[in-house]
């Protein structure tokens, strides 16, 4: 499972489509479709909308999450970052914001990769093992065992 989060209009979906070589047919938009219509699409977009739907039905969002996450292990989950803006005035909006924050934290704890998108750029918070360089990659760069003091230019 891969988690991508970021603020409004920061390029989360565009980044996911480009980086993971997907197209619009691979996207399930949780803001416009009920979760019951999910048909195995690889990208689940606007995951924060599931929190709104759960709260409107008087269901615990984290319970829904626990029930559905096992089905999403091979998916890319895209959600909105909350908590960096103003605290909402209404109690209902504050409840939604807290629930989305808790959902994001639980998803991040379970995801193989976690990326924050800001201005269309990715900040990797957790990197998937298959994305890292193989152990012998350092041998191919000619950089192993170099002392930074002896080669200061290469380290800037």
Across the structure, where does each feature detected by a protein language model lie?
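Generic hydrophobic/packing signal
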Residues: 5, 20, 45-48, 86
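Short, solvent-exposed loop/turn segments at secondary-structure junctions
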Residues: 10, 49-50, 83, 122
């Amino acid at each position: 499972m891969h988690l991508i989060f970021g603020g409004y209009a920061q390029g989360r979906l565009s980044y996911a489509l480009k980086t993971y070589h997907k197209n619009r047919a691979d996207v399930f938009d949780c803001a416009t479709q009920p979760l019951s219509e999910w048909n195995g699409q690889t990208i689940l977009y606007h995951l924060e909308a599931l929190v709104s739907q759960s709260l409107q039905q008087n269901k615990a969002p984290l319970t829904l999450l626990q029930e559905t996450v096992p089905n999403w292990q091979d998916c890319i989950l895209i959600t909105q970052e909350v908590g960096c803006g103003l605290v909402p005035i209404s109690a209902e909006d504050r409840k939604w914001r807290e629930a989305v924050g808790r959902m994001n934290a639980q998803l991040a704890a379970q995801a193989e990769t976690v990326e924050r998108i800001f201005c269309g750029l990715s900040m990797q918070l957790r990197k998937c093992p298959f994305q890292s360089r193989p152990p012998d990659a350092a041998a191919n760069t000619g950089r192993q065992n170099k002392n930074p003091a002896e080669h200061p230019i290469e380290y800037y």
